[in-house]
Amino acid sequence: MKQALRVAFGFLMLWAAVLHAEVRIEITQGVDSARPIGVVPFKWAGPGAAPEDIGGIVAADLRNSGKFNPLDRSRLPQQPATAQEVQPTAWSALGIDAVVVGQVTPNPDGSYNVAYQLVDTGGAPGTVLAQNSYKVNKQWLRYAGHTASDEVFEKLTGIKGAFRTRIAYVVQTNGGQFPYELRVSDYDGYNQFVVHRSPQPLMSPAWSPDGSKLAYVTFESGRSALVIQTLANGAVRQVASFPRHNGAPAFSPDGTKLAFALSKTGSLNLYVMDLASGQIRQITDGRSNNTEPTWFPDSQTLAFTSDQAGRPQVYKMNINGGAAQRITWEGSQNQDADVSSDGKFMVMVSSNNGQQHIAKQDLVTGGVQVLSSTFLDETPSLAPNGTMVIYSSSQGMGSVLNLVSTDGRFKARLPATDGQVKSPAWSPYL
């Protein structure tokens, strides 16, 4: 926990002021069919009101995963603070087989102890499936809640939790000196801060695999340029600023390379930079347009969008040579893919019959499932555990962020209050 807090603290060193206009998750579909679970408000052992609702954070995280449906607080049969106080029959009568309880205790030095227990209501009374405690300062109470959520989620599903991750996105506001902002927030929209403000468009943020940097496209020099910004100190490295288009950056999973698209020779083609030496290699060639690269887990293979067959489709190619292979065949066109961290599936923008939605394709069987039902969906980005996708869509005269689970059951919206939100990128584990 201490190491995790040190890593996360680096994000706050540069931005002391957190924005007040934030995005918040609004669930639109899918919770009722999820697994029921009990999350009891954590007992506050100090004077006055609790500084943070840790139980509420855990319940929201589990609900936002799409896999759990926490029992409403008004229906809780009891409010125990420890496993020993849990009455299994009271919970099992409501179909609840697991309950999260906990306490928050203030320390004399101003810090807090946060403790939780995950209790099995189907076993002997007091049976604990998982438990932990953390000592944190006030600003890390939400992080402690997300940590508990990660551990509970993994214990119950066998899947690593992704509640301590962040999202990067571009916000376009109306007017002002800097109408374009690259922002980062917790995955649930809290703790939002500005990475970069610009009078010109910002596009295509992409995370480094260690979560310490963002690559993105800026037009501040009068033409497009690719840059990499270190989040802890704000240092910016220019990667490419060739004539015409520079765009679509993507870090390799091993962190040694950056793929991107350039049109300096005419058509859009893919290039890969060795980040240590700065050497750039051209990967694709020809008259077709090749763009939107995403890496397979081996850090040697790219999936990308190409119009070599007429309409945009997704292809894959080894960066060390060989012919590109088309991998999408359903729908009139497919583009802007994001490959899962295990390489078993990808999500993409799929168009058919005039509709443009987010779809998931199994990379073994080729099977395709349409996940979203919003309007003009684009720029999908997978959570690092592969359970959720964040993407942007059109709503009214603007754009908003949306979440959908990769099984298609759970859907949510992250509306912003101060502008159009687009180009989301989900961070790696932090």
Swiss-Prot record:
The keyword Signal appears for this protein: yes
Domain of life: Bacteria
Signal peptide region: 1-21
Annotated Gene Ontology cellular component terms: periplasmic space
Gene Ontology biological-process entries: cell division; protein import
InterPro entries registered for this protein in UniProt: 6-blade_b-propeller_TolB-like, PD40, Tol-Pal_TolB, TolB_N
Subcellular location: Periplasm
Alphabetically ordered keywords of this record: Cell cycle, Cell division, Periplasm, Signal
Family: Belongs to the TolB family.
Protein function: Part of the Tol-Pal system, which plays a role in outer membrane invagination during cell division and is important for maintaining outer membrane integrity. TolB occupies a key intermediary position in the Tol-Pal system because it communicates directly with both membrane-embedded components, Pal in the outer membrane and TolA in the inner membrane.
Subunit structure: The Tol-Pal system is composed of five core proteins: the inner membrane proteins TolA, TolQ and TolR, the periplasmic protein TolB and the outer membrane protein Pal. They form a network linking the inner and outer membranes and the peptidoglycan layer.
Name listed for the protein in its UniProt record: Tol-Pal system protein TolB
Species, as recorded: Salmonella typhimurium (strain LT2 / SGSC1412 / ATCC 700720)
Lineage: Bacteria, Pseudomonadati, Pseudomonadota, Gammaproteobacteria, Enterobacterales
